[in-house]
């Protein structure tokens, strides 16, 4: 009986640890990408310039807002 209880507790501990690790890593990555977006305003300006568009502040902010809403 003690062996069965030990195996049961080990399995429960592994499941709880895996679940906590998953949600902890998920929260960390959300916070990281919010603080350090994968693309910056300077990169958007350079991209628009390469495509032949004149990068106004309004267009740059629209693109940044669209990207922020997609991350949520």
From Swiss-Prot:
Q: Where in the cell is it found?
A: Cell membrane
HAMAP family, per this entry? UPF0154
According to the record, the segments passing through the membrane are 3-23
Highest taxon in the source lineage:
Bacteria
Native source organism of the sequence: Lactobacillus acidophilus (strain ATCC 700396 / NCK56 / N2 / NCFM)
Q: InterPro entries, from UniProt?
A: UPF0154 (IPR005359)
- Coarsely, its chief localization is membrane
Q: How does it sit in the membrane?
A: Single-pass membrane protein
Q: What is this protein called?
A: UPF0154 protein LBA1278
Q: One Pfam family, short name please?
A: UPF0154
Keywords assigned by UniProt? Cell membrane, Membrane, Transmembrane, Transmembrane helix
Q: Which GO terms describe its cellular component?
A: plasma membrane
Q: Which family does it belong to?
A: Belongs to the UPF0154 family.
The uppermost taxa in this organism's lineage are: Bacteria, Bacillati, Bacillota, Bacilli, Lactobacillales
């Amino acid at each position: 009986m003690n062996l069965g209880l030990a195996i049961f507790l080990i399995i429960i501990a592994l499941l709880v640890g895996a679940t906590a690790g998953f949600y902890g890593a998920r929260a960390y990555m959300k916070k990281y990408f919010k603080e350090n977006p994968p693309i910056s305003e300077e990169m958007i300006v350079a991209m628009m310039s390469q495509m032949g568009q004149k990068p106004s502040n309004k267009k740059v902010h629209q693109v940044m807002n669209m990207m922020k809403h997609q991350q949520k």
